[in-house]
Each structure stands twice: as C-alpha cells, then as structure tokens.
Amino acid sequence: LQSVLKIINDNITNKDLTPRYIADRLAISPRSLYRKMEEIGEDSPTDLIKECRLHIAKDLLLTTKKTIDEIVFDSGFSNKVTFFKVFREKYELRMKHLEEVRQ
C-alpha cells in the first residue's frame, strides 16, 4: 500500500494517473493491483486516487487563498464539473457555501 500511495502522491497532478498507470509503475497488471488492494481491505485504486485528490483540495481550500480553478488543477482533477461533483458527494457541501465560508 505504501508504494501505491507514494506513486499517487508523486503524480497527483498528472491527469494520466489511473490504476493502469500505478500498475505499470509496480510492474503488475491492473487486475493484480485491484486484487491486492482488495486482499488488504483497501478501497479500489480509483477510489484511493479520488480520496487523495479530495484531501489535497480540501486542504488547499482551507489553508490557502488560491482560486477554485487553481485548486482544481493543483489537486489533479481534470475539470471543475468533476471536482464539484465528487467534492459534494464526499463532503455534502456545495462550492457556493464553501466559498462563502472562505471569505
């Protein structure tokens, strides 16, 4: 798991960061990656990538004055629509409310 997290953290802004990308770096098949993560009781690689990106975005939102566009890019999301959707699903908070709190 540590090697998976290192690959994710080292490549978080890489739009090509996918389970296949991680598996290639570990010299295993994507199926083997999913299986190994399941065996240790972890989320899927896709969910782990999303969680890491959300954690970074939340930290940037709370600790910086960066714009939403900058935060979307810096946390590795491909676009604002995707970011807003997964952020709302995870934190049950709309961006409008968060922007009000940040001011």
Residue positions per predicted region:
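Terminal helix-turn-helix DNA-binding modules in bacterial transcription factors
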Residues: E39-S78, E100-Q103
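Residues within the alpha-helical elements of helix-turn-helix
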Residues: Y21, R25, D74-S75
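…primarily DNA-binding HTH/wHTH and HhH modules…
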Residues: K85-Q103
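Extended, amphipathic alpha-helices with heptad-repeat/coiled-coil or helix-bundle character
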Residues: D24-R25, Y34-I40
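Basic, amphipathic alpha-helical hairpins
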Residues: L5-L17, M37-G41, K58-T67, F87, ...
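Short coil turns linking two alpha-helices in DNA-binding domains
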Residues: R25, S29-P30, S78-N79
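Residues within helix-turn-helix
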Residues: R20, R31, T67-E70, V81
